[in-house]
Amino acid sequence: MVLFYRAHWRDYKNDQVRIMMNLTTLTHRDALCLNARFTSREEAIHALTQRLAALGKISSTEQFLEEVYRRESLGPTALGEGLAVPHGKTAAVKEAAFAVATLSEPLQWEGVDGPEAVDLVVLLAIPPNEAGTTHMQLLTALTTRLADDEIRARIQSATTPDELLSALDDKGGTQPSASFSNAPTIVCVTACPAGIAHTYMAAEYLEKAGRKLGVNVYVEKQGANGIEGRLTADQLNSATACIFAAEVAIKESERFNGIPALSVPVAEPIRHAEALIQQALTLKRSDETRTVQQDTQPVKSVKTELKQALLSGISFAVPLIVAGGTVLAVAVLLSQIFGLQDLFNEENSWLWMYRKLGGGLLGILMVPVLAAYTAYSLADKPALAPGFAAGLAANMIGSGFLGAVVGGLIAGYLMRWVKNHLRLSSKFNGFLTFYLYPVLGTLGAGSLMLFVVGEPVAWINNSLTAWLNGLSGSNALLLGAILGFMCSFDLGGPVNKAAYAFCLGAMANGVYGPYAIFASVKMVSAFTVTASTMLAPRLFKEFEIETGKSTWLLGLAGITEGAIPMAIEDPLRVIGSFVLGSMVTGAIVGAMNIGLSTPGAGIFSLFLLHDNGAGGVMAAIGWFGAALVGAAISTAILLMWRRHAVKHGNYLTDGVMP
């Protein structure tokens, strides 16, 4: 068996050497910036993105930049030793590739311990559907190679493209994990949202630290290629402790039940691998319990945990809302256009079936799914059945969206408590997982919803629905203005998500006006970026002008994040102008008393609006016209503020003041 594993390792190493020898197939001389000078992180990312786009590796720089900035917001990409590895995984990437910039002057980049100086930037462009391909193997090899101090130093000191490419082609490689007899064993899992850079570099640093400390360290990488280096049963059984270095859910986490675990961000091992291993060795293992002792760093605040749970539940419920709303809307349109009202109401007719299918997704499934996956976010798989039960109870007592949220939180926290306090011998693991957890959780969460908190929540939900239905005049204007402010305040951030959740909650209760407001406002920021850069290009930097060329298309699709690059560059003036115009748009749509029951339809919402007696054409004109009016106001304000800033030297552009 030992000989088999040695032979397997030798074959693996040979494959890795062949892969590393071809790293240059994923880059090009024109994708290398040597001794570059950038004034900001955004400028560096934009410059490298433009180089990849010029090589035909990226179809849409805007979509790619949006994804890169989204990844930047999730966690640090500066990895120490002067290295930053920003990356984006999106359909805008035609072919996996990377670009490199060595900097003449270090940039401040967000790292594990706060901002740090960076003089080497490697930008990875990752397509979403290339897992397991040679391209992805090359990218994973690259990120592993960046953990090699000698190779990284050669790249940083390269003065010509040939020297840099030669450093990438170096045959140096990583060493296999050494096996130390009578030494403790640490099992690890690394995983990051993109599944490339941090996943493999964190694994490499943990293995290096293990060799240095004389500890058996085995790392399972859950990356873009799926699970690599899967931990064996022997490794898990002999493990003293486990380190989870991840920012996404661990796959098959039940394998680690009973092993004391240390959970940290995926970038943590890159800077503090030895300290993490030493800390993990202090954790105590109990073979008689299945409860994992976790030392979570950093500990999530209740506010953060609640937000993540709600957004997780919503992310699973939205496809049901979109599908159900669209099917129901199509059935209604067919009945109206072709005069099929009788067929629409005739039980068991084909049109009635579609009506019931769409209505069932919205009225029956949506609430239990929302509750179940809100609970799942808090307590993993054991909370699913109790979450579904709590959602079903919410349906039974008519507490709607609000009941789903409350029920999901009850089920999630209840099952977390049960997991932490109900401890049985490991012989009863199956009984605990497949019987006690779902039965106790269902009885507990279901009973609390039906007989304790459900009725008060239903009263609040029904009161809120009645208030929303009764809004008119100044109240509707105020609601529209508030939603407009929230939608454009942070362009897809927490405030925007809070408005989105409110609108979905209202929609689930049969109130469609708030989402009509939200959908119209989403176009304002995108239209403003395009209009302002077209009308006065000299007031904007080159990357802002490039962004503006296609942002309007993202606006038609209902995507606000396309305006983020401009907002990051000049937040006060840009966000301020977006918000003012969006408040006007929201107020106009709110006053029109129109509704929208299909989220995510973008410009096609024009055909799905609930006109409430105003007429379909007038509702569509008013809804889209409100977005144009808001964009015009935002554009005028932004140009005025930007012109003043440029004139007084408070903002520097690539052009000359007109």
From Swiss-Prot:
One of its GO terms (biological process) is phosphoenolpyruvate-dependent mannosylglycerate phosphotransferase system. The active site is at 87 (tele-phosphohistidine intermediate), 192 (phosphocysteine intermediate). It is found in: Cell inner membrane. Disruption phenotype: Cells lacking this gene are unable to transport mannosyl-D-glycerate. One of its GO terms (cellular component) is plasma membrane. It catalyses: (2R)-2-O-(alpha-D-mannosyl)-glycerate(out) + N(pros)-phospho-L-histidyl-[protein] = (2R)-2-O-(6-phospho-alpha-D-mannosyl)-glycerate(in) + L-histidyl-[protein]. It is an enzyme of class 2 (transferase). The chain crosses the membrane at residues 314-334, 359-379, 390-410, 434-454, 475-495, 501-521, 552-572, 574-594, 621-641. The gene is mngA. Its main location: membrane. Residues 186-282 form the PTS EIIB type-2 domain. The modification Phosphocysteine is found at residue 192. Residues 335-358, 411-433, 496-500, 573, 642-658 are cytoplasmic. Gene3D superfamilies: 3.40.50.2300, Mannitol-specific EII, Chain A. Pfam families: PTS_EIIA_2 (PF00359), PTS_EIIC (PF02378), PTS_IIB (PF02302). One of its GO terms (molecular function) is protein-phosphocysteine-sugar phosphotransferase activity. Keywords: Cell inner membrane, Cell membrane, Kinase, Membrane, Phosphoprotein, Phosphotransferase system, Sugar transport, Transferase, Transmembrane, Transmembrane helix, Transport. The phosphoenolpyruvate-dependent sugar phosphotransferase system (sugar PTS), a major carbohydrate active transport system, catalyzes the phosphorylation of incoming sugar substrates concomitantly with their translocation across the cell membrane. This system is involved in mannosyl-D-glycerate transport. Also involved in thermoinduction of ompC. The PTS EIIA type-2 domain is phosphorylated by phospho-HPr on a histidyl residue. Then, it transfers the phosphoryl group to the PTS EIIB type-2 domain. The PTS EIIB type-2 domain is phosphorylated by phospho-EIIA on a cysteinyl residue. Then, it transfers the phosphoryl group to the sugar substrate concomitantly with the sugar uptake processed by the PTS EIIC type-2 domain. Residues 306-641 form the PTS EIIC type-2 domain. Its EC number is 2.7.1.195. Residues 1-313, 380-389, 455-474, 522-551, 595-620 are periplasmic. This is PTS system 2-O-alpha-mannosyl-D-glycerate-specific EIIABC component. It is a multi-pass membrane protein.
